[in-house]
Amino acid sequence: MKVIYKITYPNGKIYVGKDLTDSINYFGSADSGLIERDFSREQRRDFSVRKEILWESETASDSEVSAKEVEFIRALRSNDPKIGYNQWPRRNGEIYA
């Protein structure tokens, strides 16, 4: 099963990604440095994230899954640094600092 998922962090920010294997243990490849800046050492001692499956398919090609991932990133605005941790696709030429 191929899936598009959303990870929600304790601060409410999100990360949208794809998993072509539907691994229960896969939580994406968001930039750890971006996430670490948003949490103190104390907050990191007790840290929970939520993973939601937004879309799934047994028949979609890998390129269809990639297109669906971009669709969800744009719809949920997870590439807006105020909302999420996706760094791609870029929003209006913005670069994460």
Model-derived segments and spans:
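Structure-specific nucleic-acid interaction/processing domains
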Residues: 1-97
